[in-house]
Every structure is written in structure tokens, then in C-alpha cells.
Amino acid sequence: MAFLDNPTIILAHIRQSHVTSDDTGMCEMVLIDHDVDLEKIHPPSMPGDSGSEIQGSNGETQGYVYAQSVDITSSWDFGIRRRSNTAQRLERLRKERQNQIKCKNIQWKERNSKQSAQELKSLFEKKSLKEKPPISGKQSILSVRLEQCPLQLNNPFNEYSKFDGKGHVGTTATKKIDVYLPLHSSQDRLLPMTVVTMASARVQDLIGLICWQYTSEGREPKLNDNVSAYCLHIAEDDGEVDTDFPPLDSNEPIHKFGFSTLALVEKYSSPGLTSKESLFVRINAAHGFSLIQVDNTKVTMKEILLKAVKRRKGSQKVSGPQYRLEKQSEPNVAVDLDSTLESQSAWEFCQVRENSSRADGVFEEDSQIDIATVQDMLSSHHYKSFKVSMIHRLRFTTDVQLGISGDKVEIDPVTNQKASTKFWIKQKPISIDSDLLCACDLAEEKSPSHAIFKLTYLSNHDYKHLYFESDAATVNEIVLKVNYILESRASTARADYFAQKQRKLNRRTSFSFQKEKKSGQQ
């Protein structure tokens, strides 16, 4: 055992004794603060002195280099073990073997058979590089496109070509629509024109895209340069234009409509438009009537009857009981279905089932309706929105926007940034198909500034009621508009609702009669 009182030697011994056993290198950091104290105790020598060692009183060497251990050299590759020469040589041999595998050795052999000069010449025959005369034949697709280029440059609808989605299928939302063109000849109108449009386009942009593609394909007859002269109607799969519904709103986005078949129809701006639109035939039937629009008086009564039956049955199959037409003024006298409307000299008829008569009291004489009422009934199918308040349970109200059209009723909540919605009911958007509507009645009218109406519809085999409030004028307009739509459609849900309501009324009347009878006997 050795006793040392020199701190310099002790520090050097601790730092250098554990070099091989300490992987962390913490031995070099032992008592590192004492180096500063030693420098203060033993200041460095003057520049004139030679050497860096300090002699103590006992003659022992006092100066040591304490920066790091003597066995560790500081460099950038500290901690990286160098590869030995053997490993480097083995790596070089491995690469040489891989290169030898990639190389293919071919042994040269002398040719035994002798070939003539002519045979050798035939192996490498000289090709003729003379220019061949141009072959006159069918034009290439590029030539045809270049010839059609001036036509495309003169297309007045070029601004709508940016809505063409044929080059964006799979990358951007697009919509494929089959468009029928009634303005074509009788043969061309049977085949639709397929248009691929961007989903973000409006109806007006789609009309312009249809006109652009129509003109680019060189179709005849030529279109009007004004896009506003055309509109889009709903069409059947066979190309028949559905005139029961109004044209699509030109300002609405096309992705809002789920129709895959449309028809491009020209808007009539001539003075004869009013007389053409006012040709309506009224067909009275059980539980309502229908207004059938005709183009002229040359239409046969059979076509009018088929349209009336299809209108009453809606999406159901037309097959079923047979019907006949009778003039409103001549009961029990069947109309010849092969005759024209012009020969009948009447505009009001009755739809009667075969083997039955109007004497049973099924039909009642309705008062003549004026043309203003007819126009109101027709305009009721046009979309119109109203701002009303929806009444919930506990008399809570929510401001909503009520949109009414011929095919559905939409209820969209109106967000109010100022009012706090913490204690209010959060209303979700509701869309009700017109075939599911049952009734719309005025529930309460307290004053001209406050009225309540009830909307009844079928949902999951159950009848639900929604209550709304607004001023009396708005409520009366909504009730009248919805009732016009219900009378013109005559859906099965509405008929079942009134039948169930009548059964409940009869059951209630029968119960009250039995109760009065028992009390009389007592």
C-alpha cells in the first residue's frame, strides 16, 4: 500500500488507471474542477523559462498534462473501429468474384466450313435508301384534327370548355350525363350525347359545355350563340322530356341534382308562348284532379288518358284497372279514345273506372277555376324558400329555411352567430320527398304577425308532425303551395293517411255512441 499526498499524482493515477475498464469515459472527468485550483496554486512559468514543469519544495515534478488519458487520441473518427487489412483484402476478393460472375467467356473456334463470297455478301445485304413516293390514301387523325382546328377556334362557346371533365376522370370529381337534343331531327334525337362535366360546375356552365361539345362535333342545326336561350329539363331513359317538372335552376351546382339523363330544350321567346303553355286539360278523378298539359289540340284522347293514369299512379305500374274518359257535362257517356281533343269541344273530363259510373257519387261538380288559379297551381312546383321558426318540444324554437319544390321539401337550420346555442336544441337538416307528404294544415292564427301550421309526413311506417310558426301571410302561402302540390301528385302515403284518419274518426264516433247508449239504458 502506498500513501500519496500529492493531489496531482492522485488525479493522474485515477484518470489513467481505468482507461481499459471504463467505457463511458467518466474517469477522465474525476475532480476536473481541481485542475483550476492547481493552476492558481502553481501559476505557469514566465516566457523566459524553459520547460513547463514546476519544481516543488521536495524536488518532485509538479507539472502534468491533464487534458485526457495518454492512451486516447482525440479525432473525428473517435469511437469508430478501423478495419483490419485482412477484412479489406477479403472484401476486395469478394468483389472480384462477383465481377467474374458477370463476365461471360467465349472460346474462339476456327471456322471449318468455307463459304463463297456471294454467300457472305447475302449475310449483310445492302439496303436501298431511295425516297419512296408518298402513298395517297386515308388521312391520318392528326391531319383531320388540324383541319378541324379552325372550327374549334371559331367556337363561340370556348369559354365553357374548361368545365369539360374528360381529362380529369379519376383525379377530380366529375359527373357523366346523357343529354338528349330534341332540336335534332327525328333520327338523331334518339341517341343521347354523353357529356362529362366537372362536379363543381353550375347548371348554366353545363349548358355552355353542351353547346361547346355540340358545336365542336359539327352537329346540325347550329345553335344560338346565347347560352341563356336554352334550359335543361329532366328526361326519361328513352329521351322523352318530363314537362311535369320545371327546368333546373341555372344558378344551382350540378352535383346537387342526381339525374343522369337530361334534355337540352330551347326557351320559347316568341309571343305564342303564352298560348302554348295555357293548353291544359282538366281530368277529374276520385279524391282530386289532374291538369294535363298538351302541345296542341291534335292530340288524341287516348294519350291524354295514359298521361292522366300515369300521373295518378306515380311510380306504380300503369297496369291494373281499365279506365275511360267522360265529359264533365255528359255523365255516363264514354269518349272515343281515338278522337282528337279538338273534336270534343271541351277541356274538362272525368276519369271513370270500367264497369262503374259517376252516379255513385264518387265525383262532385267543382266550380270552374280561373286561369289565375291554374297558374298558381303550376307555379307551386317551382322551388321557393321561406324563413320560418321550427317549434320543438317545451316550446323551443329554431330558425330554419324551408325550401319547397315539386319533388321535395328541405329544412335547413339557419346558424345564428350572436345567439348562444348552449341551451338550445341543435336542429339537423331534413329532406322530405313529396311522395311522403301527407297533409299541411293551419294549426293556429292568433294575429297577422303570428301563425302556426303543421306538416305531416310518413317516416319509417309512422306519421310524424312538424310545427312551424311565422307571420300569417307567409304561413298561408306555404299551406296553399304545399296543398297544391299534394293535390296534383295524389300519393299513396296521403291516401293511406286520410284513410287511417277516417277509421279513427269512425271508431271514436262508434265508441261515443255506445257510451251514450249504455248511459241511456241505466
From Swiss-Prot:
GO-annotated molecular function: enzyme-substrate adaptor activity; phosphatidylinositol-3,4,5-trisphosphate binding; phosphatidylinositol-4,5-bisphosphate binding
Subcellular location(s) of the protein: Cell membrane; Endoplasmic reticulum membrane; Early endosome membrane; Late endosome membrane
Keywords from the named record: Acetylation, Cell membrane, Cytoplasm, Endoplasmic reticulum, Endosome, Golgi apparatus, Lysosome, Membrane, Mitochondrion, Mitochondrion outer membrane, Nucleus, Phosphoprotein, Stress response
Segments for region (SIN1-type RBD): 279-353
InterPro entries, A to Z: CRIM_dom (IPR031567), PH-like_dom_sf (IPR011993), Sin1/Avo1 (IPR008828), Sin1_N (IPR032679), Sin1_PH_dom (IPR031313)
Function: Component of the mechanistic target of rapamycin complex 2 (mTORC2), which transduces signals from growth factors to pathways involved in proliferation, cytoskeletal organization, lipogenesis and anabolic output. In response to growth factors, mTORC2 phosphorylates and activates AGC protein kinase family members, including AKT (AKT1, AKT2 and AKT3), PKC (PRKCA, PRKCB and PRKCE) and SGK1. In contrast to mTORC1, mTORC2 is nutrient-insensitive.
Family, similarity comment: Belongs to the SIN1 family.
Activity regulation annotation text: Phosphatidylinositol 3,4,5-trisphosphate (PI(3,4,5)P3) promotes MTOR activation by relieving MAPKAP1/SIN1-mediated inhibition of MTOR that takes place in absence of PI(3,4,5)P3.
N-acetylalanine modifications at: 2
Upper lineage: Eukaryota, Metazoa, Chordata, Craniata, Vertebrata
Gene Ontology biological-process entries: cellular response to insulin stimulus; TORC2 signaling
PTM per Swiss-Prot/TrEMBL: Phosphorylation at Ser-128 by PKC promotes relocalization to the perinuclear region, where the mTORC2 complex specifically mediates phosphorylation of SGK1. Phosphorylated at Thr-86 by AKT1 or RPS6KB1 in the presence of growth factors; the effect of this phosphorylation is however unclear. According to two studies, phosphorylation at Thr-86 by AKT1 is part of a positive feedback loop that increases mTORC2 activation. According to another study, phosphorylation at Thr-86 and Thr-398 by RPS6KB1 promotes dissociation from the mTORC2 complex, leading to inhibit mTORC2 signaling.
Domain text: The CRIM domain forms a ubiquitin-like fold with a characteristic acidic loop, which recognizes and binds AGC protein kinase family members substrates. The SIN1-type PH binds phosphatidylinositol 3,4,5-trisphosphate (PI(3,4,5)P3). It plays a dual role in mTORC2: in absence of PI(3,4,5)P3, it binds and inactivates MTOR. PI(3,4,5)P3-binding relieves the inhibition, leading to mTORC2 activation.
Region (Interaction with NBN): 2-267
Top-level division of the source organism's lineage: Eukaryota
Residue intervals of the CRIM domain: 139-267
Region (Interaction with ATF2): 468-522
Ranges where the record places region Interaction with MAP3K2: 2-184
Residues found modified as Phosphoserine: 128, 186, 315, 356, 510
Gene Ontology cellular component terms for the protein in this record: early endosome; early endosome membrane; endoplasmic reticulum; endoplasmic reticulum membrane; Golgi membrane; late endosome; late endosome membrane; lysosomal membrane
Protein name according to UniProt: Target of rapamycin complex 2 subunit MAPKAP1
List of residues that carry Phosphothreonine: 86, 398
Principal location: membrane
Residue positions binding a 1,2-diacyl-sn-glycero-3-phospho-(1D-myo-inositol-3,4,5-trisphosphate): 393, 428, 464
